[in-house]
Amino acid sequence: MRRVVAQGTFDLLHPGHLYYLTEAKSMGDELHVIVARSQNVTHKQPPIVPDEQRREMVAGLDPVDSARLGHTDDFFVPIRDIDPDVIVLGHDQHHDDERLAEMLTEEGIDCEVARASARDGDDKILSTGRIVDRICEERC
């Protein structure tokens, strides 16, 4: 059984999230998703949707076998619990693939790191930021 981990904020779900999770699922048999807690999102605007609600929405998506919130203090706790064969990063996530692989090795976690491919949106709104911008353009 090949276990795959995907992770992210997953605020205001959109087709880009589904593309990412579908591709991640195709890399294994089980897809486990770690949803970032609001307090740990420091590289961009904080999420609009509460933590548990974002986790629940992700858990309801067809490719997802399990979804959990990330640990408040230690990024590696859920990864150790899941014991994945591969961690798939989103095409636009800020993580450095090589540094993450080094950190996993330092933590004694043996898994590969892959990156999902970018998708052509065909005019679909594929980012939370673009959704928020569109709401402001149309409704504010």
From Swiss-Prot:
Which InterPro entries does the record cross-reference, listed alphabetically?
Archaeal_FAD_synthase, Cyt_trans-like, FAD_synth_RibL, Rossmann-like_a/b/a_fold
Q: What is its EC number?
A: 2.7.7.2
Family the UniProt entry places it in: Belongs to the archaeal FAD synthase family.
Q: What residue ranges are annotated as transmembrane?
A: none
GO:BP terms for this protein?
Answer: FAD biosynthetic process; FMN metabolic process
Which cofactors are named for this entry? a divalent metal cation
Gene Ontology molecular function: ATP binding; FMN adenylyltransferase activity
What name is this protein filed under? FAD synthase
Q: Which domain of life is it from?
A: Archaea
Q: Does the keyword Nucleotidyltransferase apply?
A: yes
Annotated ATP binding lies at 9-10, 14-17, 92
Claim: ATP-binding is one of the keywords in the record:
yes
Which keywords does this chain's UniProt record carry? ATP-binding, FAD, Flavoprotein, FMN, Nucleotide-binding, Nucleotidyltransferase, Transferase
Q: What is the lineage of its organism?
A: Archaea, Methanobacteriati, Methanobacteriota, Stenosarchaea group, Halobacteria
In which pathway is this protein known to take part? Cofactor biosynthesis; FAD biosynthesis; FAD from FMN: step 1/1
Q: What does this protein do?
A: Catalyzes the transfer of the AMP portion of ATP to flavin mononucleotide (FMN) to produce flavin adenine dinucleotide (FAD) coenzyme.
Give the reactions, separated by semicolons, that this protein catalyses.
FMN + ATP + H(+) = FAD + diphosphate
One of its Pfam families is: CTP_transf_like
How the protein assembles, per its UniProt entry?
Homodimer.
Q: SUPFAM superfamilies recorded for this chain?
A: Nucleotidylyl transferase
